[in-house]
């Protein structure tokens, strides 16, 4: 069954008091599988199945949890990955497979795209540090391979980060941050994000961040009842 069909049926099934009906677990898991295969995403569904696993530990399926975590990484910089981690019980998070995803998430959340692409391309060299998170780097690319659209999603995430951190960026550096993307792909992404070419196309103008700074006025409404006791108290004011 297609993702759209499963999604429609599930949103009807998990509405209101039926949201955490354990009988929905099988259909939710099938929908997650469809998300992976068809490169789709539904935040409500992935968070609902994690909550159901918390409430019904006997139905827990780590394979589905891994897929959910990887899908939430594909929508960075949203907070879905952080939310998903919070819905996994502490007695589960020590799993080697889950730790591997958490370590990958830490790399992406810190915008360390150089390490990510090395892991994807098989060029990452593990350190001798006992706490080295990627002792077997090949496991990362193997884990991600079934996730349709994962690398493209990370490229778009990198572009969003670039949009808020760079004013100008060289094409060579941009290509590197996008995993060695071709000139054609770099140009297409630059156009999509509204970056202009400069210096014969070797540099992209991203944004004039200094010219787009917006001030914010913060108003706080204080009710009279909140300060009435202070105004009527006999405590003398502090001397400076």
UniProtKB/Swiss-Prot annotation:
One of its GO terms (biological process) is positive regulation of apoptotic process. GO terms for molecular function: ribosome binding; RNA binding; translation initiation factor activity. One of its GO terms (cellular component) is eukaryotic translation initiation factor 3 complex. InterPro entries: ARM-type_fold, CSN8_PSD8_EIF3K, eIF3k, PCI_dom, Transl_init_fac_sub12_N_euk, WH-like_DNA-bd_sf, WH_DNA-bd_sf. Disulfide bonds: none annotated. It is found in: Cytoplasm. Keywords: Cytoplasm, Initiation factor, Protein biosynthesis. Residues 41-221 form the PCI domain. Pfam families: CSN8_PSD8_EIF3K. Component of the eukaryotic translation initiation factor 3 (eIF-3) complex, which is involved in protein synthesis of a specialized repertoire of mRNAs and, together with other initiation factors, stimulates binding of mRNA and methionyl-tRNAi to the 40S ribosome. The eIF-3 complex specifically targets and initiates translation of a subset of mRNAs involved in cell proliferation. Belongs to the eIF-3 subunit K family. Component of the eukaryotic translation initiation factor 3 (eIF-3) complex. This is Eukaryotic translation initiation factor 3 subunit K. The lineage of its organism: Eukaryota, Metazoa, Ecdysozoa, Nematoda, Chromadorea. The gene is eif-3.K.
């Amino acid at each position: 069954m297609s993702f759209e069909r499963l999604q429609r049926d599930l949103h009807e099934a998990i509405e209101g008091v039926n949201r955490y009906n354990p009988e929905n677990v099988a259909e939710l898991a099938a929908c997650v599988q469809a998300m992976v295969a068809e490169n789709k995403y539904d935040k409500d569904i992935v968070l609902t199945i994690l909550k159901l696993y918390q409430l019904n530990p006997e139905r827990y399926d780590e394979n589905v949890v891994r897929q959910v975590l990887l899908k939430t990484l594909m929508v960075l910089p949203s907070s879905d990955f952080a939310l998903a981690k919070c819905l996994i019980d502490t007695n589960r998070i020590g799993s080697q497979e889950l730790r591997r995803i958490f370590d990958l998430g830490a790399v992406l959340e810190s915008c360390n795209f150089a390490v990510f692409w090395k892991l994807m391309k098989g060029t990452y060299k593990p350190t001798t540090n006992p706490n080295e998170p990627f002792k077997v780097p090949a496991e990362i690319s193997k884990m991600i391979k079934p996730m349709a659209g994962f690398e493209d999603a990370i490229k778009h995430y990198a572009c969003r980060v670039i949009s808020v951190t760079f004013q100008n960026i060289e094409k060579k550096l941009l290509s590197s941050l996008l995993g060695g993307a071709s000139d054609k792909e770099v140009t297409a992404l630059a156009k999509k994000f509204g970056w202009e070419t400069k210096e014969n196309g070797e540099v992209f103008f991203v944004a004039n961040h200094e010219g787009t700074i917006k001030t914010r006025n913060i108003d706080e409404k204080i009710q009279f009842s909140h300060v009435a006791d202070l105004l009527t108290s006999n405590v003398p004011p502090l001397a400076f």
